[in-house]
Regions:
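Terminal, low-structured helical/coil segments at or just beyond the last alpha-helical repeat
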Residues: 179-222
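Alpha-helical segment of the N-proximal tetratricopeptide repeat
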Residues: 42-66
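TPR/TPR-like (Sel1-like) alpha-helical repeat modules
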Residues: 161, 166-184
């Protein structure tokens, strides 16, 4: 009986040792596989950056979409993801990612940030969320190059136009006209003609609005 018990204990010990050995082997294999996957994902992230820099936004998006599901991407890569969605005309996802990323990029280069604000503003604009687009265009104007200002003023003109804010629409179309003339002379003849027509059409509305405002003030004064 004692010998049988001893043999049973010995057999159990050998089984436990074997199980432990197999577990360690599996754990080591899993760790090695995990390490390999992380290295592969890091290489994929590098490829995404290369695609983004070369303006291959579709390819960049395919990589970042997958990585975004597995990791917590840093704000810059979140911004890259948002911009890639913008260029794929997926404006809702562009807004989702850029809105999260931009506030965390305050220490980045001004022009880089202006580009993200532009993509966010354009996404809101294309979704017809004009009121939300306005502050984004204004933030872009604080950071962008002078030659880029005309586009923002032009879009702001339409944002205010669609909101029937005639005076601000006129002011921004006028600013766009001046910016095109000063920083991009002769580049956008069709756009300049359109802006000229918009200003003419708005002149009457702005004048009528001013007259109504004066009339209201005079009535209050009496």
């Amino acid at each position: 009986m004692h010998n049988l018990l001893y043999k049973s204990k010995g057999l159990a010990t050998r089984w436990l040792t074997l199980i432990a050995f197999v577990f360690v082997c599996l754990l080591t294999h899993a760790q090695n596989a995990q390490s390999h996957n992380k290295q592969k994902d890091a290489e994929q992230l590098g490829k995404a950056l290369e695609y983004f820099a070369s303006q291959k936004y579709h390819e960049c998006l395919l990589i970042l979409q997958g990585l975004d599901k597995q990791y917590r991407l840093n704000p810059r890569y979140k911004a890259y993801l948002g911009v890639s969605y913008y260029y794929e005309w997926d404006y809702e996802n562009a807004v989702k990612h850029l809105s999260v990323a931009i506030p965390k990029l305050v220490n980045f280069a001004p022009h880089e940030r202006s580009f993200y604000y532009w993509a966010l503003a354009e996404s809101f604009f294309n979704l017809r969320h004009y009121e939300k687009a306005v502050p984004c265009y204004h933030e872009m104007l604080k950071l962008c190059y002078d030659k880029e200002r005309a586009e923002a003023y032009y879009r702001l003109g339409f944002c205010y136009l669609f909101g029937e804010d005639w005076a601000d629409a006129w002011s921004n179309f006028y600013a766009a006209q001046n910016s095109f003339r000063k920083y991009r002379p002769g580049e956008e003849p069709a756009r300049m003609a359109q802006i000229g027509n918009m200003l003419k059409a708005l002149n009457g509305k702005v004048a009528n609005e001013a007259l109504m405002h004066i009339g209201i003030n005079e009535a209050k004064g009496k």
